[in-house]
Amino acid sequence: MIQQERLLKVLRAPHVSEKATNNTEKSNTIVFKVALDANKVEIANAVEQLFEVKVDSVRTVVVKGKTKRRGAKMGQRSDWKKAYVTLQEGQSLDFVEGAAE
């Protein structure tokens, strides 16, 4: 069992984009920004315990930070990890419930 403190650090935020919204509607997949050191088991456990839903599968991808320039200085944005969490049939998770009102 993962400690409650670690569960809260694994999931950073829901990732909201056009592609993520289409995935939610078509395949019941929610996209999260997660900790870079989090693994699939931790992500699945965190979603199940925090949102009380059943997870079917988890896919992850590390998004590389873009190189940015400000004047003569070059810098790089931080890398971050994105997790595609597919929920089991009949399960749903709605972040914008009541926001349209």
Curated annotation (Swiss-Prot):
Transmembrane segments: none annotated. InterPro entries: Nucleotide-bd_a/b_plait_sf, Ribosomal_uL23-like, Ribosomal_uL23/eL15/eS24_sf, Ribosomal_uL23_CS. GO terms for biological process: translation. One of its GO terms (molecular function) is structural constituent of ribosome. Keywords: Ribonucleoprotein, Ribosomal protein, RNA-binding, rRNA-binding. GO terms for cellular component: ribonucleoprotein complex; ribosome. Pfam families: Ribosomal_L23. Belongs to the universal ribosomal protein uL23 family. Part of the 50S ribosomal subunit. Contacts protein L29, and trigger factor when it is bound to the ribosome. PANTHER family: 60S RIBOSOMAL PROTEIN L23A (PTHR11620). NCBIfam families: PRK05738.1-1, PRK05738.1-3, PRK05738.2-4, PRK05738.3-2. One of the early assembly proteins it binds 23S rRNA. One of the proteins that surrounds the polypeptide exit tunnel on the outside of the ribosome. Forms the main docking site for trigger factor binding to the ribosome. This is Large ribosomal subunit protein uL23.
